[in-house]
């Protein structure tokens, strides 16, 4: 992803990372380990009008075509998917005595998406490359991770990614 490459060498990025803890498994689009935080990004390339609430199981995607036709389809609430991924990552970290805050961001990468979402203040959603890059550069975790712990976390996920 171009945006993430703009961050610099101090950020370690894993893409399409399969994670598993006990019976729970998922694939993370992007896992970023920065000098101060650990972040999961769920990337969606949906276009049209997306509406939903943080607590809904499903969101609605509505598309309007040039000929005036419209379609409406349901999509799984991506916030729920991210929370599940975060819980798996946190379980992996705790099992390795690496308790660490894990943040999540939902990123809609299409230039033709319009979001109508009812979210918590703590839900991070970006709908442009510029917005995502700004978030990544300015985000301050509730508790800054120490360098030694982040190095161990990098090593742990490197090993997972290689296997």
Regions found by a protein language model. Give the residues of each.
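A contiguous binding-surface segment within folded domains or other stable secondary-structure elements
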Residues: 55
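Surface-exposed interaction regions that form or flank ligand-binding interfaces
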Residues: 1-26, 32-38, 44-52, 60-163
